[in-house]
Amino acid sequence: MNIVLTDEHKYFVDGKHFDGVTNIIQLEGGSPGLEWVDPWYLERGQMVHIATALYDLGILDESTVDPRIMGYLTSWKRFREDKPPYKPEHIEVKMVDTLYRYAGTIDRLPLLDIKCGVYKKADIAQLGAYFGLCQANKIDRDLYMGPDARQVVYLDEQGGDPIVDAYTVSQVQAARDSFLCALNWHRFKHSK
């Protein structure tokens, strides 16, 4: 299966369009659409995700990191070194649910989502959608059901301790169900 994410943040699986997790949440009012977001915040998010991924892979040259995001990287390092330390097994994983026809890129497995901005109620819906992708792909249960899974990490711009929201399995299952309702509602509205 070939999963492609375009620059316009659209997913194509073997050439067919699949709804993306972030797009569905935006379209259903969980967060502002990309047209309403200052391009700097989109760029910042991309830079932070790349820097943290390279750090986790052990290949980051910190002299190349934009000083504007260094605090976020420091905050990520603090999270990684916390007790017990978080050890990612997979980084920036693209997945697809062929039954519900949606796709997304999971920041880390064990299931974790990295945020640079402020808390939004929709963040748990995003984590729930990723939980659903893990189930659909029948990955190792410890990667989404284990003690290190189901976290949203809000990095601190100044490099301080991040805020970590950890969720129970039942909370994330409920969020997954809510996401699937939003996905189906979106498709129903646009099928006429």
Located regions from the model:
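Metal-dependent nuclease catalytic cores that hydrolyze phosphodiester bonds in DNA/RNA
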Residues: 1-103
